[in-house]
């Protein structure tokens, strides 16, 4: 990796600190108190090794390193095809050669992402041309989208490269096949909205000339209407993968394809150059027409999360092009005043669903862009740019006329393949058009305009928001009824005049019965009025077709659109920042059994009822069997009484012999490390307290776990749990403690906003600011090193407690010297942490550099990009569709019948899987509770752990899953994913009743023995959820990103603690990446802008709706710096922000408790925002949330089962005896009246208050009548005397 000397020193410092920590951790581990005597987190391998491990092609890693040393990665991905063609990696058939070469190239191009090379390519085969020759067919699947356009296109090129080497002919399409492609790709665009839709001419050119047949699996439910039942096209269903590769791959990435064709001197691709150079160019109007309002982000609207702007509506977010030091990488900037005026719903770190350019954006504060314009109750119209002023005026706002600007970088358009759009006219654009300096006043701005420079944006109003006729009426009103008094323009206050001024966003206030405008000179000029308020001659031939043209004609100025493009948005997921805890949270991984009670308490176990011939506190537990190699004694502890470290013993569960292998050679049974022992918990607990020198009264509650579920079942020393309890810390499944935070990008910071003295920062290498000046002041801007992070202040306090715990551990348990000696968060600045994200099981080494007041984690885009699957019991019933019919069957049967044994795969957590033999679909659910059909992209088989988790719900649903399986629970009004072990009795899970989604309460959760040696799973596209035994749950997913103290991970993490199941190793630091190579991280970070301004060509391109790739040469992005020393430093930004923690720190959504309060706040805000239709919001909430819940719960009530409170037995109907026939316990319903009526009154109130359609009102009233007939009229409340006083 090419880096500067400064970055090289930075890496050396990090690795020096890491080496010191490793030496200390190794000394602690050598004491023998842990399952292993060595550290269990190795350093991560490079990209080449990841590709080899992912695909299993032995020897490919070394060849990749050789190629990458000589050429670019894209060229290496093509050249590797020569080795496959030469059969260097063991392939035999042409199909196998082609398949492996294409997958290897895909893995290389996507940095080893699983979905692209495995799930994105269905299969590779050969077809027959009409002349009898063979041709190559690549079947693409839906997950190919994750590979990106470049990798998609180059996979076709790799296929052709190897095809030629093998002597296979090109694909010769039939005319009807060409027409089928054109129709199908257009139809797919109507379903899924392609980011780039090629013209018919481009599509025809690609299909007729591409030497490879781009085929695909059916991914959608729709079928094509024409060109059906073609001989060489296997399905009539729309093929999404094919459409993506043709449109967003070959068409969109044609220049990159051509570049590699020329490098490799490949034949048969000349047509690419013709398509690039001779393709039809759309004019401005055509491009503009393509940018239409998109309401997808508000289709699944739910109660409590407000809409801030409807699609492209006046008053909505105005696009501002640029990047601040805390935006980019899917984060958008908003003025803090906007965040406050919008009711504090958008706190720093809140996710917002947006209309474009992507689907979502993280909210961050940028105070150098414009805030909202509001109308106060006094009638005054004022723009608010200051957060303090916004907080002061919040209670006086009558209407939010404009919500302000939204800062979006050029790179976001590039990343999302979205055409550029005209931004709001701003000062940086004005300067590029000749503006000499910021005008001191209005008069100077007019002077600049008279000199030929466009009118300054501060004095440009929203002229294109009003019609030319409105401008004419306003000019008439000002000319006939206006006067200038003491430098203030006074206009007669009429409803029409006031409304037009409000649409123009002209600041004004009421003075008696007149409207007062202080800065009015530019306003009068644009109205074509003189200073004496008389009409200028320009009115005689004024053009009345376009408002901006009219204003420019009347004033003689060049006037730009101040509105630019409006972007819609609504609130998404609220932020989160808190310690990671299992449910219930334990202090120690010590099995306490049922004797610990519901809280798994050591104190309860110690005082449990004495057994015969014991003093009490004695339990029986299933733990791992271990043997001392020195004295031969058998125990459950990691350290023998003789002082030697013990080893796990794996016995055959049938013959009981220690065979020293994973499988018994005699019984062919898998060996287990398991024994049932009697433990005197009280004696062990008191001995641990004494050895630590801790008084028993110091620990009010010490919590263990009910049982152990790993393969080895090692028992963690009680001492560790005691020391955690002293610091109020809870252990995670792998022995570590960790803290979850929402990630936000940051490339620069100031000392005064991170709470660290400049002296300490200088010690850490921050000696100069971004502009090369020596660091002497705490308001200088410093460039963040890409492995330095900021954590929230809450996380800082938590880290201090962890540091004290680790020091206590080193001193009291391991007999070593303390390491951190921290008393306050500042003491930990400069220390190393480990960042961990889901889906990779890889930690990233980072250094703590400061603290954020906002409850988020700020890190470099490279850090976030560097961090980027759980199973069912075999008899779990799932419902699947093959596109023709629905069928219900056990998951074991479905997986085994559809596992393609000829092409099994092995993913990064060691799970075998394959694509299903044919396309299947399941019902899937998103976080808002909306269901849809999604394709099954793979099936998998896993070795079962010893124990599973079984849930039962009030409605009689029962589901058995592995302990780490991703479950869905309702968090007020959205679905949150947690692990099965964290699900608690009382949690509400989504279930399917009569085709509807309703909430069902978990009434029991127990750990059960696995009766089968295998568990099974599906991978589902997009939402990664499905229905199992009637319960919506996850499949293969992760959790939030988190951080942990480095030494805690090095000392306490052990693979031996991890659950023995697929997913058990997820979210665990199996490897540690010590150096982040920008070229190997997620490519989204490569689209981060690193320039300090955009040239005029970019703004002109925005006016022409150009594609960002056409302007790539004008914008300095990370991608252009890869492979040079500048790839890690020298980044700049276009917009300043004074405080990265400005604005609300907690969302109103989180602060409000009940749904009623949240709904009232949502609708009240909708009433006040001009860009929002409150009646439509109310109706959408009814249709997509409340009515669906009411109907589903009512249906469930009528079909419910009854349950025994004692033994949890379920009955379809009440037993005739009126009690449980098994145990005689009391039998109760599983669905209660309150859950059915929950949203009824709220729904009726909405219908009475808002303009709801008659149809929706009638639906609510029908539900009301059905509920009333079911439960009867509510009883009248007995009133007392106090009720009348």
UniProtKB/Swiss-Prot annotation:
One of its GO terms (molecular function) is DNA-directed DNA polymerase activity. Its EC number is 2.7.7.7, 3.1.11.1. One of its GO terms (biological process) is DNA catabolic process. Pfam families: PolC_DP2_cat, PolC_DP2_central, PolC_DP2_N. It catalyses: DNA(n) + a 2'-deoxyribonucleoside 5'-triphosphate = DNA(n+1) + diphosphate; Exonucleolytic cleavage in the 3'- to 5'-direction to yield nucleoside 5'-phosphates. Residues 565-586 are annotated as: Disordered. The keyword S-adenosyl-L-methionine does not apply. This protein undergoes a protein self splicing that involves a post-translational excision of the intervening region (intein) followed by peptide ligation. The keyword Ribosomal protein does not apply. PROSITE patterns: INTEIN_C_TER, INTEIN_N_TER. Keywords: Autocatalytic cleavage, DNA replication, DNA-binding, DNA-directed DNA polymerase, Exonuclease, Hydrolase, Multifunctional enzyme, Nuclease, Nucleotidyltransferase, Protein splicing, Transferase. It comes from the Archaea. NCBIfam families: intein_Cterm (TIGR01443), intein_Nterm (TIGR01445), polC (TIGR00354), PRK14714.1 (NF011302). Heterodimer of a large subunit and a small subunit. Belongs to the archaeal DNA polymerase II family. Possesses two activities: a DNA synthesis (polymerase) and an exonucleolytic activity that degrades single-stranded DNA in the 3'- to 5'-direction. Has a template-primer preference which is characteristic of a replicative DNA polymerase. This is DNA polymerase II large subunit. It comes from Methanoculleus marisnigri (strain ATCC 35101 / DSM 1498 / JR1). The gene is polC.
């Amino acid at each position: 990796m090419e880096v500067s000397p400064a970055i090289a020193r930075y890496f050396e410092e990090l690795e020096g600190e890491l080496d010191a920590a490793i030496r200390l951790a190794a000394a602690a581990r050598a004491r023998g108190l842990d399952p292993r005597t060595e550290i269990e987190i190795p350093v991560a391998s490079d990209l080449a090794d990841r590709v080899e491990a992912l695909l299993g092609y032995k020897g490919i890693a070394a060849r990749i390193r050789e190629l990458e040393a000589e050429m670019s990665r894209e060229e290496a991905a093509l050249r590797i095809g020569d080795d496959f063609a030469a059969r260097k990696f063991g392939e035999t058939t042409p199909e196998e050669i082609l398949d492996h070469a294409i997958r290897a190239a895909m893995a290389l191009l996507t940095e080893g992402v699983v979905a692209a090379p495995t799930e994105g390519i269905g299969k590779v085969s050969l077809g027959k041309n009409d002349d009898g020759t063979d041709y190559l067919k690549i079947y693409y699947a839906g997950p190919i989208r994750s590979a990106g356009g470049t990798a998609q296109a180059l996979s076709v090129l790799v296929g052709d490269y190897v095809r030629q080497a093998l002597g296979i002919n090109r694909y010769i399409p039939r005319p009807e096949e060409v027409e089928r492609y054109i129709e199908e790709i257009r139809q797919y665009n109507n379903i899924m909205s392609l980011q780039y839709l090629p013209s018919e001419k481009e599509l025809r050119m690609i299909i007729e000339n591409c030497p490879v047949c781009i085929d695909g699996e059916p991914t959608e439910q729709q079928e094509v209407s024409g060109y059906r039942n073609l001989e060489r096209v296997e399905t009539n269903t729309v093929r999404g993968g094919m459409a993506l590769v043709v449109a967003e791959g070959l068409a969109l990435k044609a220049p990159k394809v051509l570049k590699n064709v020329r490098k490799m001197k490949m034949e048969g691709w000349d047509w690419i150059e013709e398509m690039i150079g001779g393709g039809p160019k759309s004019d401005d109007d055509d491009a503009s027409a393509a940018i239409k309002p998109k309401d997808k982000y508000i289709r699944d609207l739910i109660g409590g999360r407000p809409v801030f702007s409807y699609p492209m509506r006046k008053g909505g977010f105005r696009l501002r092009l640029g990047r601040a030091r805390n935006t980019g990488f899917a984060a958008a900037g908003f003025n803090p005043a906007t965040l406050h005026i919008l009711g504090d719903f958008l706190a720093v770190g809140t996710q917002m669903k947006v209309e474009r350019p992507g689907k979502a954006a993280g909210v961050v504060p940028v105070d150098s862009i414009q805030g909202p314009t509001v109308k106060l109750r006094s009638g005054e119209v004022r723009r608010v740019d200051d957060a303090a002023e916004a907080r002061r005026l919040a209670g006086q706002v009558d209407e939010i006329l404009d919500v302000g600007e939204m800062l979006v970088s050029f790179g976001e358009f590039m990343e999302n393949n979205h055409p550029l759009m005209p931004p709001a006219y701003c000062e940086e654009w004005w300067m590029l058009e000749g503006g000499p300096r910021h005008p001191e006043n209005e008069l100077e701005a007019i002077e600049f305009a008279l000199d030929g420079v466009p009118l300054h944006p501060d004095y440009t109003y929203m002229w294109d928001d009003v019609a030319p006729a409105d401008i004419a009426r306003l000019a008439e009103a000002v000319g006939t009824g206006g006067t200038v008094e003491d430098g203030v323009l006074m206009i007669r206050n009429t409803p029409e005049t006031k409304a037009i001024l409000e649409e123009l966003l002209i600041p004004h206030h009421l003075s008696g019965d007149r409207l007062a405008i202080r800065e009015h000179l530019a306003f009068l000029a644009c109205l074509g009025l003189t200073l004496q308020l008389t009409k200028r001659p320009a009115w005689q031939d004024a053009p009345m077709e376009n408002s901006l043209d009219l204003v420019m004609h009347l004033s003689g100025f060049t006037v730009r659109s101040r509105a630019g493009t409006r972007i819609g948005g609504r609130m998404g997921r609220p932020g989160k920042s808190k310690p990671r805890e299992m449910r219930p949270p334990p202090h120690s991984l010590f099995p306490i059994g049922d004797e610990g009670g519901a809280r798994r308490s050591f104190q309860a176990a110690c005082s449990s009822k004495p057994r015969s011939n014991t003093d009490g506190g004695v339990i029986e537990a299933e733990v791992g069997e271990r043997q001392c190699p020195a004295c031969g004694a058998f125990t459950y502890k990691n350290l023998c009484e003789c002082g030697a470290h013990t080893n796990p013993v794996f016995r055959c569960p049938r013959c009981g012999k220690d065979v020293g292998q994973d499988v018994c050679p005699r019984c062919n049974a898998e060996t287990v490390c398991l024994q049932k022992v009697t433990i005197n918990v009280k004696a062990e607990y008191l001995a641990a307290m004494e050895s630590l020198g801790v008084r028993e009264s110091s620990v009010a509650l010490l919590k263990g776990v009910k049982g152990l579920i790993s393969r080895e079942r090692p028992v963690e020393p009680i001492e560790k749990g005691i020391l955690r309890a002293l610091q109020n810390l809870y252990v995670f499944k792998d022995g570590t403690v960790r803290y979850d935070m929402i990630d936000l990008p940051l490339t620069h910071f100031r000392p005064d906003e991170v709470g660290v003295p400049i002296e300490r920062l200088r010690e850490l290498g921050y000696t100069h600011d971004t502009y090369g000046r020596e660091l002497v002041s705490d308001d200088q801007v410093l460039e963040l090193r890409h492995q330095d992070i900021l954590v929230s202040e809450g996380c800082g306090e938590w880290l201090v407690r962890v540091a004290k715990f680790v020091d206590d551990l080193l001193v009291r348990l391991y007999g070593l010297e303390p390491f951190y000696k921290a008393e306050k968060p500042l003491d930990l600045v400069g220390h190393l942490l480990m960042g961990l994200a889901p889906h990779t099981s890889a930690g990233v080494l980072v250094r703590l550099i400061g603290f954020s007041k906002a409850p988020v984690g700020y890190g470099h885009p490279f850090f976030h990009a560097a961090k980027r699957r759980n199973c069912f019991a075999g008899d779990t019933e799932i419902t699947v569709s093959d596109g023709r019919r629905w069928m219900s069957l056990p998951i074991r049967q479905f997986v085994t019948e559809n596992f393609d044994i000829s092409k099994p795969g092995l993913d990064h957590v060691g799970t075998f899987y394959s694509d299903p033999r044919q396309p299947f679909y399941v019902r899937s659910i998103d976080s808002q509770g909306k269901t849809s059909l999604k394709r099954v992209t793979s099936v998998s088989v896993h070795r079962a752990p010893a124990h599973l988790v079984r849930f039962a719900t009030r409605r009689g649903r029962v589901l058995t899953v592995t302990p780490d399986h991703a479950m869905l629970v309702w968090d007020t009004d959205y679905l949150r994913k947690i692990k099965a072990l964290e699900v608690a009795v009382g949690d509400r899970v989504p279930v399917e009743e009569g085709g509807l989604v309703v909430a069902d309460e978990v009434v029991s959760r127990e750990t059960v023995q696995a009766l089968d040696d295998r568990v099974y799973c599906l991978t589902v596209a997009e939402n990664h959820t499905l229905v199992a035994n009637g319960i919506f749950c996850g499949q293969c997913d992760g959790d939030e990103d988190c951080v942990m103290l480095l030494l805690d991970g090095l000392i306490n993490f052990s693979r031996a603690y991890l659950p023995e199941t697929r997913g058990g190793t997820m979210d665990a630091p199996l490897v540690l990446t010590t150096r982040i190579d920008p070229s190997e991280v997620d490519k989204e970070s490569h689209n981060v802008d690193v320039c300090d301004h955009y040239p005029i060509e970019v703004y002109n391109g925005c006016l022409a709706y150009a594609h960002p790739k056409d302007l790539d040469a004008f914008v300095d992005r990370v991608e252009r710096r890869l492979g040079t020393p500048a790839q890690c430093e020298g980044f700049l930004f276009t917009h300043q922000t004074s405080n990265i923690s400005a604005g609300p720190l907690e969302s109103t959504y989180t602060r409000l408790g009940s749904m009623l309060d949240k709904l009232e706040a949502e609708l009240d805000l909708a009433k006040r925002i001009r860009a929002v239709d409150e009646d439509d919001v109310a109706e959408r909430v009814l249709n997509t949330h409340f009515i669906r819940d009411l109907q589903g719960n009512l249906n469930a009530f009528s079909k419910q089962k009854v349950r025994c409170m004692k033994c949890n037995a379920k009955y379809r109907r009440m037993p005739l005896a009126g009690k449980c026939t098994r145990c005689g316990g009391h039998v109760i319903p599983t669905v209660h009246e309150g859950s059915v009526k929950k949203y009824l009154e709220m729904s009726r109130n909405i219908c009475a208050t808002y303009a709801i359609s008659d149809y929706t009102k009638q639906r609510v009233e029908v539900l009301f009548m059905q509920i009333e007939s079911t439960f009867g009229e509510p009883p009248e409340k007995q009133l007392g005397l106090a009720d009348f006083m």
